[in-house]
Amino acid sequence: PLNFGVAEEEAKERARKALKLVGLPEDLLKKSPFDLSGGQMRRVAIAGVLAMKPEVLVLDEPTAGLDPRGRREIMDMFYQLHKKEGISIVLVTHSMEDVSQYADKIIVMHRGTIYKEGTPREIFSSPKELVELGLDVPETIRFQLKLEEKLGREIGKPSLSLEELVSNLHLLKTGETGYDG
């Protein structure tokens, strides 16, 4: 913020607020970058951007290289920034787990052009089509497709979460389809 003419005291206040937004303690400002974990370094970098008060964050593979816990924490943080602070987030990722759980809208690119766009439910409603194109689908859907192949029948609508898959399996057991229509 100082480079954009923000007064020093306001810049410090923005930095403190940004650290809080990304879930880091204020005393981290006194630490050497070499003492931070990979996840903390990413959060500090994001806090630096948030101190600028952006309306939109454009993120390219922000969870690459993080362990599952770190990935979930970072994605939860982006989700909260969107919901509580009203920041629009454009996420470029190959992680279908992340988009199925966190995205409001997905744009699928294939060979440099927009192939499909919609909600996670709409995009993953025809997973076999995506797989045939060589695109990935969430792990729960991959598991569901393998299970359906073994059973020789559909379980229900594609499951975007483990909870949905369990619900679809329960519906199958009770003789229902899991489809709304």
Kindly give the residue locations of the regions a language model identified.
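Conserved ABC ATPase "signature" region
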Residues: 10-27
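Conserved ABC ATPase signature
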Residues: 32-36, 40
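Conserved catalytic motifs of ABC-family nucleotide-binding domains
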Residues: 53
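Catalytic Walker B motif of ABC-type/P-loop ATPase nucleotide-binding domains
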Residues: 57-60
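A short, surface-exposed alpha-helical micro-motif characterized by mixed small hydrophobic
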Residues: 99-101
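ABC ATPase "signature
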Residues: 117-118
